[in-house]
Design a protein with these regions (language model features):
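Asp-box/BNR beta-propeller blade signature and adjacent active/binding-site loops
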Residues: 1-347
Length: 347
């Protein structure tokens, strides 16, 4: 089939951004995102969601997940992430943070029923960090929440950390240092369980140098981590990795060219999609790596802003990806693309 594009939510009164997506067991879609004043103005923020019962062809009106925050920037909701747990419940986490002092940021949790009809929360998990990965449930039953932070533990640069729970969130342990390196700013992790307790952490490098996707591995369920290496995804920001039904790995990400001048519109113009395999993501050797990359979304606006994505694959094989974009609208809004593996081409 040809790629199809959809509007998920387009409310010109607010800035809609940073979506994530989850499918229930019945394949009902829930798209969570933040509405705020602007990317650079969080004087108003609220986490909302919309639902679809027809594989994302039409969407409900927005439903509030959080209470709104009105502030001078001292507190705001940031980036929600959603997971369907093995028992069917829908777990949504989001960082509540501050532009004044990000070390005060903490992750909050909402728990929903298996169809996402009702959510309870938020519960402050008291996990320190911003822009969390999805709550990851390992095959062992361990829960992991990865988030990053700078200017902590005597280390100025951004470092990637995680917290874990072995009793379904009743008690949390950490932080565990996933990756920190004085040469880099490591953040916005996407952790993938490649085999039982073998984890690969894909990371954004935030020095505006166009570095490839940074990665490291754990062989013990996230308790310890190895050395940094790169996966051949140049300029990779906010990767979102998962398995396709073929056994291949799909990664969606913002392409961020190496340039330090300007901000929105200068280097937030493209979202890419990549297909790769287990050997590639677990190897630091170029002769063992392969990846196929295709452009997904382009924002022509002079104030372009996009590239935080979420995706699912339906049982019929269709891949459905949500993103946010400015485009020809007065403010950013939520869009989606539907495609199939054959639309991407072979490795």
């Amino acid at each position: 089939m040809a790629m199809q594009r959809f509007d998920v939510s387009c409310d010109p009164s607010v800035y809609e951004a940073w979506p994530d997506l989850v499918a229930t067991q019945s394949e009902r879609l829930l798209c969570f995102f933040c509405e705020c004043t602007h990317h650079g103005d969080r004087s108003y923020s609220r986490i909302v969601y919309v639902a679809s019962d027809d594989h994302g062809r039409t969407w409900s009106d927005k439903i509030a997940l959080s209470e709104p925050i009105h502030s001078d920037g001292s507190a705001f909701w940031n980036c929600p992430r959603a997971t369907r747990l093995r028992d069917g419940r829908i777990a949504v986490i989001c960082d509540r943070t501050s532009r004044r002092d990000e070390t005060q940021a903490e992750v909050h949790l909402w728990m929903g029923d298996p169809e996402g009809m009702h959510f309870e929360g938020p519960v402050n998990l008291h996990l320190q960090g911003i822009v969390p990965d999805k709550l990851l449930e390992l095959q062992s039953g361990r829960w992991i929440v990865a988030c990053h932070l700078g200017n902590v533990d005597g280390f100025a640069n951004l470092q990637q950390r995680l917290y874990y729970s072995d009793d379904a969130g009743a008690h949390w342990h950490g932080p565990v240092t996933v990756a920190r390196d004085a040469r880099y700013n490591l953040c916005e992790a996407s952790i993938l369980e490649v085999e039982p307790d073998l984890l690969v952490c894909f990371m954004r490098e935030n020095s505006s140098m166009g570095y490839e996707c940074m990665a490291c591995m754990s062989h013990d369920g996230g308790l310890t981590w190895g050395e940094l290496y790169t996966v051949p995804l140049a300029g990779c920001h906010r990767p979102v990795a998962g398995f396709l039904d073929t056994g291949e790995i799909l990664i969606t990400y913002r392409y961020r060219q190496g340039a330090q001048k300007g901000w929105l519109g200068h280097w937030t113009q493209n979202t890419f999609l990549a297909v790769t395999d287990r050997e590639t993501v677990c190897s630091a050797s170029r002769d063992r790596q392969q990846v196929r990359i295709m452009p997904l979304h382009y924002d022509p606006s002079s104030e372009a802003d996009l590239g935080y994505t979420g995706w699912v694959q339906f049982r019929d094989g269709e891949i459905y990806i949500v993103d946010y974009i400015r485009g020809d609208q007065p403010k950013c809004h939520i869009i989606a693309t539907a495609l199939r593996r054959e639309d991407i081409g072979g490795l």
